[in-house]
From Swiss-Prot:
TM segment ranges: none
Record keywords, A-Z: Transferase
Functional description taken from the UniProt entry: Probable CoA-transferase.
InterPro entries to which the protein is assigned, alphabetical: CoA-transferase_III (IPR050509), CoA-Trfase_fam_III (IPR003673), CoA-Trfase_III_dom3_sf (IPR044855), CoA-Trfase_III_dom_1_sf (IPR023606)
Transferase in keyword set: yes
Any one of the GO CC terms: plasma membrane
UniProt protein name: Probable CoA-transferase Rv1866
Signal peptide, first to last residue: none
EC number of this enzyme: 2.8.3.-
Active site: D558
GO function term, MF aspect, one: transferase activity
PANTHER family: L-CARNITINE COA-TRANSFERASE (PTHR48228:SF6), SUCCINYL-COA--D-CITRAMALATE COA-TRANSFERASE (PTHR48228)
A Pfam short name: CoA_transf_3
Length: 792
């Protein structure tokens, strides 16, 4: 794999190739004389960019001079013999060596060429620049973050770039798998904006806030109604978060509170009744927490079965007992002469970590050649233009968002996905509003699936599942650790049914370690990994009665966890096809979070231990009020030059040399005054007008979009990101994504409607297992299986 990222253009491109390097790819980074400019991007540790050091581990580096004819020939020779080329920016780094990324794909038929830009290579906003905060604004994530009124709160910097990188890695590995199938590579015009819209907090995917986009008959443009759905309380040494959902969890909390007489009525077993009375219950919980430490509260809550976790600070995460025990953190010489704790990576394969092995190389450390000849591959068996996963069969035991997204990604690309469901414990995404037969979330997440109703606790049900495993390629599950084994389907058992099977799983804190048995709700994962603590803003401070955190309405990291799982599962299937052996792969949601924000965690840990000098990022990203009712835009000032250009747009060039704002450190120190000065300009313009004027001057800015705005975004329309999906049980068409990225040789996702529970049970058992009508009828009558009425 040829990595042409400069570490600056299209932020996060280095992460794409790091992901594939972790999985064993030979990644050769091509740098110009003097090295990539990304080596100096802040924050820096002992003079080296932390982000560059983290995202270029496990790679090699060769220096080629684009002005030297012999080096230009060497570059083309490398591209000709590569499997994948990853480039970034417009026109891209490859163009300096004589051929753009698209031209390389034209020239070398086998090559998969990925071009990553902020907004895509063409379209009305292709020249726009993006930062993470700009992507939060334009993707709709910002509109769901912050108080009900007042300034919206930016999510932590880094999540958007890391999410886009995972989506890009998935897209390029899909194209590579397709090359193995049909013999032809591809060119992918990848937009980070597209990726963040689809994979961070998608407005048109499994998400509780989707009502803003499709349920209302009007154009609802409100803000979050409840930022305390998962309440946080101060305690003696910090904060704790509760996530009380099930009746048994409420009863545990009630015991902890001393069985208060006012709340003994069984009606409080229902969430709605508790929410109505929560102001009164909250007084008791606050009193309980006030005099105890985080550790004491978490231990007591766990003993009573109450979902609770500490709201930890980033500086404490890398040293936590859990991450240390499972090897998610390793002590490494991240930069020359400096050792510090670093996240190992996302992936666990057959119980072993596939992650950080070697530090980022020095520029030109290696020769411009590949380590080995390409691995032999069998002759192509598929046709160009087909779906890459045609012929793959997936048994999907996944639930809610992370599990559903994993299987959807395969179904959208042609796999036969069989969703195996229990009559007694249906998938939470099947919950609907009164009178509805199908939820929008289920329709989006389980399109292109078949539905099998099967009791896996019944001996006959187990036998049927085992027979299906023998006929399948992969099993996907995201149960609490130990659940699949308790059902009788450990990986060893599945492997005995089918030695080629891939088991891909995910859980909140992984399947081993001190926290592995903790309850795995997303809000608890965010709190335990430091995300909640940094999801805050000086511009949106609450009154003294409320904590300052605003992550309650995000669904991060569920959607990106599904994509990380898909990437790992596909890598395991590629390895299976080469070696004949299956694999057990697993993803920890908490470790996904830590690796998404690795630069922040490493900087905070290094600062806490004072291992070397750290220079922070001095960019100023802020949310500004615009003309209209609750309208906002985001502006990013990353350099003195950008500030000068911005002041010209504001019509106040004298601010460029104002001692409060003229230098980066001064802008950080005088942030509130800068925000006030810029707000005077933005408040007289619409968000699109303000962003457009700044983008024309080369300054990253973007309007805060709501879901309805996203459907009208001219760049997304130009790129055909969505098309209407019709489900016979839903009154109106739903906007649905068309695929992970625009490919040349892979068609858009099909749109077969999501099934009702057990809808395809009979068909599956007859077609795959050769059962007769009498057999399937008996199994349904005996409640081993459920489904529609049997017909001969």
């Amino acid at each position: 794999m040829l990595d042409l990222s400069d570490g600056c253009s299209a932020g996060g491109t280095d992460m794409v190739t790091r992901l594939l390097a972790d999985l064993g790819a030979d990644v050769l980074k091509v740098e110009p004389p003097g090295g990539s400019p990304g080596r100096h991007v802040r924050p820096t540790l002992a003079g080296t960019s932390i982000g560059f050091a983290m995202h270029n581990a496990n790679k090699r580096s060769a220096v080629l001079n684009p002005l030297d004819e012999s080096d230009r020939r060497r570059f083309l020779d490398l591209a000709a013999s590569a499997d994948i080329v990853v480039d970034c920016g417009l026109p891209g780094q490859a163009a300096a060596y004589g051929a753009s990324c698209a031209e390389l794909a034209d020239r070398y038929r086998h090559l998969v060429a990925l071009s990553i830009t902020d907004f895509g290579a063409a379209g009305p906003r292709s020249s726009w620049r993006a930062t993470d905060p700009v992507l939060y604004a334009m993707s709709g994530a910002l509109s769901r973050s912050g108080p009900t009124a007042g300034t919206p709160v930016l999510p932590p910097d880094g999540i958007a770039s890391a999410t886009a990188a995972v989506q890009a890695a998935w897209a390029v590995l899909v194209a590579y798998f397709n090359r193995l199938r049909c013999g032809t590579g591809d060119y992918i015009d990848f937009s980070r904006f597209d990726a963040v819209v689809m994979a961070l907090d998608p407005p048109f995917g499994a998400h509780g806030q989707v009502a803003a986009g499709i349920r209302s008959t009007g154009r609802w443009r409100g803000r979050p109604k409840n930022q305390d759905a998962y309440p946080i309380y101060p305690c003696r040494d910090g904060y704790v978060r509760f996530c009380v959902m099930a009746p048994r969890q409420w009863r545990g909390l009630r015991r902890w509170l001393g069985e208060p007489e006012d709340f003994q009525d069984p009606k409080y077993d229902v969430i709605g009744a508790r929410l109505a009375a929560w102001p009164q219950i909250s007084v008791l919980v606050a009193k309980l927490c006030a005099e105890k430490t985080m550790k004491e509260l978490v231990a007591a809550g766990q003993a009573l079965g109450v979902p609770i976790t500490a709201v930890l600070t980033p500086s404490r995460i890398l040293a936590s007992e859990h991450f240390q025990a499972v090897g998610a953190i390793t002590d490494a010489e991240l930069v020359p002469g400096v050792r510090t704790g670093v996240p190992t990576g996302y992936f666990v394969v057959d119980g072993k970590r596939a992650g950080f092995r070697t530090p980022a190389p020095a520029a030109g450390q290696d020769e411009p050649r590949w380590l080995a000849d390409p691995a032999p591959v069998p002759p192509p068996s598929g046709r160009v233009g087909g779906y890459p996963f045609e012929g793959l069969r997936i048994l999907d035991l996944g639930i809610i968002v992370a599990g559903g997204e994993l299987s959807r990604l395969f179904g959208d690309l042609g796999a036969e996905v069989i969703k195996v469901e229990s009559a007694d414990h249906p998938d939470g995404l099947r919950q609907t509003r009164v009178g509805d037969a199908m939820s929008e979330s289920f329709a989006w997440t389980h399109r292109n699936h078949l539905a099998l109703g099967l009791d896996l606790r019944n001996s006959e049900g187990k036998a049927i599942f085992g027979r299906l495993v023998a006929e399948s390629d992969a099993v996907f599950a995201n149960f609490k650790p130990g659940t699949l084994t308790s059902l009788g389907f450990s990986y060893d058992v599945l492997h005995a049914f089918n030695p080629r099977i891939v088991l891909a799983g995910s859980s909140a804190f992984g399947n081993r370690g001190p926290w592995s048995t903790r309850m795995g709700y997303g809000p608890l994962v965010r709190a335990a990994t430091g995300v909640t603590r940094v999801w805050t803003s000086d511009e949106a401070q609450p009154d003294n009665s409320r904590h300052p955190f605003y992550d309650a309405t995000t669904i991060f990291p569920d959607h990106v966890v599904g994509r990380v799982g898909a990437l790992l599962a596909l890598a395991a299937l590629i390895h299976r096809d080469r070696t004949g052996g299956g694999a057990h792969v697993h993803i920890s949601q908490a470790e996904v979070v830590v690796n998404q924000l690795d630069t922040m965690f490493v900087a905070e840990a290094a600062r806490a231990t004072d291992v070397a000098e750290i220079h922070p990022d001095t960019s100023v990203h802020a949310v500004y009020p615009c003309a209209g009712d609750d309208e906002w835009c985001v502006i990013s000032i990353r350099s003195d030059d950008e500030w000068r250009r911005a002041t010209s747009v504001f019509g106040q060039p004298e601010l460029a040399n104002d001692p409060r704002f003229g230098a980066s450190r001064s802008r950080v120190a005088n942030r509130s005054e800068l925000v006030a000065a810029v707000s005077a300009w933005t408040s007289t313009r619409t968000p699109v007008q303000a962003a457009g004027a700044l983008q024309a001057a080369g300054v990253a800015a973007g309007p805060m979009n709501r879901p309805s705005d996203i459907l009208e975004d001219p760049q997304l329309i130009e790129r055909n990101l969505f098309r209407d999906m019709v489900h016979p049980l839903i009154a109106r068409p739903l906007p649905a994504e068309t695929g992970p990225a625009p490919f040349r040789h892979i068609p858009q996702a099909p749109q077969r409607p999501a099934p009702l529970p057990g809808q395809d049970s009979v068909q599956i058992c007859r077609k795959l297992l050769g059962m007769t009508a009498d057999e399937t009828e008996r199994l349904i009558n005996e409640r081993v299986m459920f489904g529609p009425a049997v017909t001969a």
